[in-house]
Amino acid sequence: MHTWALLLAAGQSSRIAAACPGVRKQFLLWQNAPLFWHSAVMLSRVSRMRGIIFVFPEDMLEEATAMVRELDAGRALGIPWKAVSGGARRQDSVASGLGQLPAECDTVLVHDAARPFASASLTNSILDALQAGAEGVVPALAVTDTIKVVEDGAVLSTPDRTKLVAVQTPQGFSLQALLGAHRHCAEKALAVTDDASMLELLGQHTVITVEGEASNIKVTHPEDLTMLHSSEKKNMQVPCVGWGYDVHRFGSDGRPMKLGGVPIAGGPGVIAHSDGDVLLHALTDAVLGCMGLGDIGMLFPDTDAAYDNADSAVMLNEVLEKARNAGLLITHVDLTIITQIPRITPWRDQIHKNICRITRLDASSVNLKATTEEKLGFTGEKKGIKAVAAVTALRRVSS
């Protein structure tokens, strides 16, 4: 499955204009970043997301693209992105974004930039449903209010609310199904308010629901701004530091050496249950430390045969996914390899680049050092290798 997201930020914000004159809601600053950026960061932290298409107002495309470029430089998304101009209607903006997807894309998420509270967990549940074969997936919440059908101020009927749900974004689709639905609506001149409606009108695909999130509101009315400010107070981010340490012995019957996910040709064998990547093990422990989740041995015990020669990068990615779902924002990683052999210098740049790729941090946010213990201790006697890691992060806490 090759998934991209369309982030719709092309609206005119007519219903909220009086509360924020001169600024469209998708560009309102919240937690020191425009509203649309929070959704972009969330989407980029979902491991199965391959890229994002930003859809901006045509008259702001150049300015908004420069904004994304600057934001990405400071807090890297870590995945490819493009920016395109939208249209007069929501479906026109979606069509514009669909036209920019790469050839290998086969599934797409469509998300409103005005929903900054959608979580990575919700996004993953949508992707899980798509991976299981669904062609259209929408997050939905049961309707708790009684709904009336009204015409000219007069109540015509009261639908059975047990059959009603309120749908949200992101909405997920098979790309071919969504393209076909868009063509159908264009040919029939049909106007819709969401993409799932297009599949319903085409009548060839089933749209299923997953449980939505009550917190995933859409900023639409002036009073919603109050909720934004309230959320900012309730969901504060506090700095935290995680520390990791790992050691492995050398042995002629050990596994081929890997450091930071990079094979070290000619390095001594490493005795380990998994692949023995001491650097990734230390980093994994440090990330777990930021979340208060113990250590790598608790999550991936060496008594479990499933982790025999397990790829440490896969284990680290699983922990990073937990961190993203928990709202942990990793800002800096500092790593030290301590060993007499092999010399790390020939491999340093490759290791550094790979750590940046895995953590989705820019080069200035990952520091890698190597040192010896001046021939003292077990590393100095060339009996083993150790690594330490310090991770700095922002953790979301509720006041």
UniProtKB/Swiss-Prot annotation:
Source superkingdom: Bacteria
Pathway(s) annotated for this protein in UniProt: Isoprenoid biosynthesis; isopentenyl diphosphate biosynthesis via DXP pathway; isopentenyl diphosphate from 1-deoxy-D-xylulose 5-phosphate: step 2/6; Isoprenoid biosynthesis; isopentenyl diphosphate biosynthesis via DXP pathway; isopentenyl diphosphate from 1-deoxy-D-xylulose 5-phosphate: step 4/6
Residues annotated for a divalent metal cation binding in this entry: D246, H248, H281
Region described as 2-C-methyl-D-erythritol 2,4-cyclodiphosphate synthase: 240-399
Region called 2-C-methyl-D-erythritol 4-phosphate cytidylyltransferase, residue ranges: 1-239
Site (Transition state stabilizer): R15, K25, H273, T372
UniProt keywords, alphabetically: Isoprene biosynthesis, Lyase, Metal-binding, Multifunctional enzyme, Nucleotidyltransferase, Transferase
Pfam families in the record: IspD, YgbB
EC number: 2.7.7.60, 4.6.1.12
InterPro entries associated with the record: IspD (IPR001228), IspD/F (IPR026596), IspD/TarI (IPR034683), ISPD_synthase_CS (IPR018294), MECDP_synthase (IPR003526), MECDP_synthase_CS (IPR020555), MECDP_synthase_sf (IPR036571), Nucleotide-diphossugar_trans (IPR029044)
GO BP of this protein: isopentenyl diphosphate biosynthetic process, methylerythritol 4-phosphate pathway; terpenoid biosynthetic process
Site residues by UniProt (Positions MEP for the nucleophilic attack): R161, K218
Cofactor(s) listed: a divalent metal cation
Xref: SUPFAM superfamilies: IpsF-like, Nucleotide-diphospho-sugar transferases
Chemical reaction(s) catalysed: 2-C-methyl-D-erythritol 4-phosphate + CTP + H(+) = 4-CDP-2-C-methyl-D-erythritol + diphosphate; 4-CDP-2-C-methyl-D-erythritol 2-phosphate = 2-C-methyl-D-erythritol 2,4-cyclic diphosphate + CMP
Gene Ontology MF terms in the entry: 2-C-methyl-D-erythritol 2,4-cyclodiphosphate synthase activity; 2-C-methyl-D-erythritol 4-phosphate cytidylyltransferase activity; metal ion binding
Protein residues bound to 4-CDP-2-C-methyl-D-erythritol 2-phosphate: 246-248, 273-274, 295-297, 300-304, 371-374, 378
Function: Bifunctional enzyme that catalyzes the formation of 4-diphosphocytidyl-2-C-methyl-D-erythritol from CTP and 2-C-methyl-D-erythritol 4-phosphate (MEP) (IspD), and catalyzes the conversion of 4-diphosphocytidyl-2-C-methyl-D-erythritol 2-phosphate (CDP-ME2P) to 2-C-methyl-D-erythritol 2,4-cyclodiphosphate (ME-CPP) with a corresponding release of cytidine 5-monophosphate (CMP) (IspF).
UniProt family annotation: In the N-terminal section; belongs to the IspD/TarI cytidylyltransferase family. IspD subfamily. In the C-terminal section; belongs to the IspF family.
Protein name: Bifunctional enzyme IspD/IspF
